[in-house]
Design a protein with these regions (language model features):
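Generic signal for short, ordered secondary-structure residues
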Residues: 3, 57-58, 66
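Flexible, solvent-exposed extracytoplasmic
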Residues: 24-25, 46, 53-59, 73-168
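Aromatic/His-enriched, Gly/Pro-containing loop or helix-boundary segments
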Residues: 10-14, 61-76
Length: 168
């Protein structure tokens, strides 16, 4: 038996749309948002936006290692490669402030080459010196042997229309 007092009225909204949320929602492109003040495990940003914030007990270990490593070594590389276009942080008066990242790579991008590495630790170590805009790092045992390691513009395709793209 479930008591009716356990149900929440539909008119009660858990999260309120802020001015910053409204400004971000004016952008019609697919991107991610990261709330610097909330931390990686806070899911409130995901209520209105595609976000890299959020908690799940079964979070991908490699993602967590990537986040942990780059959050210490190179935040910009982390945000760019995860398509974080908007960051929410605090200004000097401790008020929420919106920051835009014009260098976000997008949902997908073309690379020139692949560097094969032998272990996840080696992959993390190579992150700090690798231009992820141009080079992909791949675990040696996870890629078919017939995949080329160098690419050029004739290898690209053009996506004309995205169907079923979520605005959120």
């Amino acid at each position: 038996y479930i008591d009716k007092d356990l149900f929440i009225d539909k008119s009660i909204k858990t999260y309120q749309l802020s001015d910053i949320d409204s400004e971000i929602l004016n952008d019609s492109l697919d991107y991610r948002v990261f709330d610097l003040s909330a931390g990686i495990s806070n899911a409130s940003t995901s209520y209105f936006h595609n976000s890299i914030n959020g908690y799940h007990a079964a979070k991908l270990r490699r993602f967590q290692e990537y986040y942990d490593y780059l959050s210490v070594h190179d935040n910009q590389k982390l945000f760019n490669s995860l398509n974080v276009k908007y960051l929410i942080g605090k200004n000097e008066d401790n008020q929420d402030q919106l920051y835009q990242n014009p260098d976000a790579f997008g949902n997908a991008w073309a690379i020139d080459s692949i560097i094969l590495v032998d272990s996840p630790d080696e992959l993390l170590d190579k992150l700090k010196d690798t231009d992820l805009r141009r080079v992909g790092l791949v675990l040696n045992k996870s890629i078919p042997t017939d995949i080329p390691l160098k690419y050029n513009s004739s290898d690209l395709i053009k996506i004309e229309k995205i169907k079923n793209s979520s605005s959120h």
